[in-house]
C-alpha cells in the first residue's frame, strides 16, 4: 500500500465537488453518531457495570473505545484503497435504518406511554426520512443539539444524585456495588452494551467524504471518541453508584418507576 494510504487520509479525486463540512462540524457529527444514534444505549451503561463490576466494566469501556477507534481508522484506509468505494452496502444501511426506528420508537414510548408503539415508530420514521435527505454539512447543526442533549442528560443525573440523601438514587449514599462480576455468564452481555456505544462505523465514511480537510480525520475521530468516553463514564459510574444492583436496562427506568423522581 502506498505512503498515501498508510500515512494520510486523502480524499479521492473523482468525488463530485461540493461544499464540505469543517473540522468542527465533522466532530459534531462523529460525536452525535456515537452518543445519540448508535449510542442510544448510553442509558444502559450502568446496567453493563452492574453485570461486569467496576474493574471489568471500566476496563471493557476503554478496551471498546480503543478497538473501535482503531477500526474507524482502518475503515477509511479501506475506503481509499480502491476508487469508487463510498459507503457500506445499501442493504446494510437499510437494516441499520430499521433498527434505529425501532430503538427510537421504544425510547419514545417511555415518554409517551399513551401513544401506541406502532404510532411512535411511524412518527420516528417520518422524522428520520427528511433528515436523511439533508446534506451532512447541515446535519452538523442537528448533531450539536444531540450532543447538548447528551450533556444535559448527564447533568440531570448528577444533579439528582447529589441532591438526594436516601437510597436508591443518591451519590452521597450509594447503593451496594461490586468490583467483580457476580455472574460471569452475564459478562458478554456487558460487552455488548458497552461496545454498542462505539459502533458508528457505518456512518463514518459519509462524514469523512464530506470533510473539507480529510487529512484531519484522525484528529476528529480522537476528539470525538475521547469526548464520548467521558460522557459514557459519567453516566455509567453515576448510574451504577445511584442504583447498584437495582439498575434497570435503562437508567431512566429507575426514575420512571420510583416515587419522588
Segments from the language model and where they lie:
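Hydrophobic alpha-helical transmembrane segments
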Residues: 30-31, 55-59, 118-123
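Alpha-helical transmembrane segments of multi-pass membrane proteins, especially transporters
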Residues: 32, 60-61, 65, 220, ...
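Membrane-water interface regions at transmembrane-helix termini and the short interhelical loops
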Residues: 46-51, 107-111, 124-146, 210
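Extracellular loop-to-transmembrane helix junctions
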Residues: 46-85
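Residue-level recognition of membrane-helix boundary sites in multi-pass small-molecule transporters
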Residues: 56-57, 138, 216-219
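Membrane-interfacial loop- and helix-cap regions that link adjacent transmembrane helices
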Residues: 2-13, 18-22, 27, 73, ...
Amino acid at each position: 500500500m502506498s505512503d498515501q494510504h498508510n500515512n494520510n487520509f486523502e480524499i479521492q479525486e473523482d468525488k463530485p465537488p461540493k461544499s464540505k463540512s469543517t473540522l468542527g462540524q465533522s466532530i459534531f457529527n462523529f460525536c452525535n453518531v456515537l452518543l445519540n444514534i448508535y449510542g442510544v444505549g448510553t442509558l444502559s451503561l450502568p446496567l453493563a457495570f452492574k453485570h461486569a463490576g467496576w474493574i471489568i466494566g471500566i476496563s471493557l469501556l476503554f478496551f471498546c473505545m480503543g478497538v473501535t477507534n482503531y477500526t474507524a481508522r482502518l475503515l477509511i484506509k479501506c475506503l481509499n484503497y480502491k476508487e469508487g468505494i463510498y459507503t457500506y452496502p445499501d442493504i446494510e444501511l437499510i437494516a441499520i435504518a430499521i433498527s434505529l426506528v425501532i430503538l427510537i420508537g421504544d425510547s419514545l414510548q417511555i415518554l409517551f406511554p399513551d401513544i401506541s408503539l406502532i404510532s411512535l415508530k411511524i412518527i420516528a420514521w417520518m422524522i428520520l426520512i427528511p433528515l436523511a435527505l439533508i446534506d451532512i454539512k447541515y446535519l452538523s447543526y442537528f448533531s450539536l443539539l444531540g450532543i447538548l442533549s447528551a450533556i444535559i442528560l448527564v447533568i440531570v443525573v448528577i444533579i439528582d444524585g447529589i441532591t438526594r440523601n436516601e437510597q436508591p438514587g443518591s451519590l452521597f449514599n450509594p447503593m451496594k456495588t461490586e468490583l467483580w462480576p457476580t455472574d460471569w455468564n452475564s459478562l458478554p452481555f456487558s460487552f455488548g452494551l458497552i461496545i454498542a456505544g462505539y459502533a458508528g462505523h457505518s456512518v463514518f465514511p459519509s462524514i469523512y467524504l464530506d470533510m473539507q480537510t480529510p487529512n484531519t480525520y484522525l484528529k476528529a475521530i480522537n476528539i470525538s471518541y475521547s469526548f464520548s468516553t467521558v460522557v459514557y463514564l459519567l453516566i455509567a459510574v453515576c448510574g451504577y453508584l445511584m442504583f447498584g444492583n437495582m439498575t434497570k436496562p435503562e437508567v431512566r427506568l429507575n426514575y420512571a418507576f420510583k416515587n419522588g423522581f
